[in-house]
Amino acid sequence: SGVPGTVNGLLKIFSDYGSGNFTLEEIMAPAIDYAENGYPINGVAAQGFDSYKALFLNDEGSAKIFIKDINNDILDIQQAFINGELSQDEYGKKLANIDEWQEGDILIQKDLANTLKRIAKNGNSGFYSGKTAELIIQEMVANNGFITKEDLLSYHSVYRDPIIGTYRNNLIISMGPPSSGGALLVQMFNMIENFDMKSMERNSTEFVHLLTEVQRLAYADRAIHLGDPDFWPSPIPMLTSKEYAKERLSLISMNSATRSTEIAAGKNLSKE
């Protein structure tokens, strides 16, 4: 994993573009309150937390927050599975019988509240050094991670040009490299706007097939053409052009699925 950049990025925006009418502590107070005292979760969150019980049990910090009313019975079930006393199917069934989250239940995250308090009080140093940094490094050491104290101290965010495109006359403004998401988003929209999506029933065979094929093409390009602009010249104008989208679409058949192994990245004409 990379060094967490959201904290530094948001603080940079606050510093560069904030009105100056509020302190950082004032702005962060509501988030701290929600983390410390809790808030009611919706049904989607409840279902999501319950579906990842087995994964959360692999990490003590996650388990105590996202498994409802965790107790020794749950830990005993996990240990029985680790010892080979339960099959994968039996393990899943026992976890499914554990008390589950319901819509409206209160989610409390005390550790997150403490982290937010340190950031609110000390800014970047409240995350990239001091107590929070120590906790991150402890986690790295315990789980063979790669982030070092020096990585945290040297991190700084930079402004990048956004990716701009259109979809049926709607303007798209998204993130630019090193994130690949913005370029792929525009590229995929460029491809699917050549189809009458309204005529397709949502989640129908035709609908899912088209989205799958479009994503296959886009991700093949991502693997070859996109990277950190400080080290790799990504052909953004080509990837986000309407003409390139039509060229890539010629590889799609609406009658059969393409094997992912048969999909190659498009030719980078800017290198010629």
Model-derived features: where do they sit?
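Gly/Pro-rich active-site capping loops and adjacent beta-alpha segments
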Residues: 1-19, 181-209
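Short alpha-helical scaffolding segments that buttress acidic/His motifs in well-ordered protein cores
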Residues: 31, 116, 188, 214-218
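Short helix/loop capping segments that flank catalytic or ligand/cofactor-binding pockets
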Residues: 136, 174-175, 181-185, 227
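Short glycine-rich loop/turn motifs
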Residues: 160-162, 185, 272
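Internal maturation/activation junctions in enzymes
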Residues: 195-272
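Noncatalytic scaffold domains of N-terminal-nucleophile
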Residues: 1-122, 127-129, 133-176, 240-241, ...
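General N-terminal targeting signals
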Residues: 44-45, 124, 164, 182-184, ...
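Short Gly/Pro-enriched turn/cap motifs at secondary-structure boundaries
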Residues: 104, 179, 267-271
